[in-house]
């Protein structure tokens, strides 16, 4: 069981302008992250592990990113009047992952396999995921499944494959024609790691 906290400090002030009628609304932020998280890891037998994580970004910037643009739109026309920005709720994330085996680069013929589910509300993910399985784009405002496997055919060589599917937006995103739901395509990655 673990708990953690991440906070940005001494950051420069960032200002965002949002159109509102004929003018702009201004939002300024100096604290990007104020993240609280908890996690648990449970060993199942000798070779399986279940991992669960949950967290929230409680900064004003996180709520801003989780919000959306407000439009005045007459149905059946292409006319939109932008009416500013609406703050969203506190963005949160959670993930569940099941790992079986352990691909150890020092142990030939060792292997691993995993499946996970991820949910990251827009504004909860701050970049740099450390997974190797998916790019950052598949973690910001997205929910998805990933499965993967690794195999060590000989010492110092690790082969891995990952497949992310059913990646969908957790909320509507701003587009030129108002807020729209979206879905990303599936994502596959194969990689080889050799240790010299």
Label every PLM stretch briefly:
Residues 1-2:
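Alpha-helical scaffold segments of alpha-solenoid architecture
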Residues 5-196:
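Outer-membrane beta-barrel pore domains
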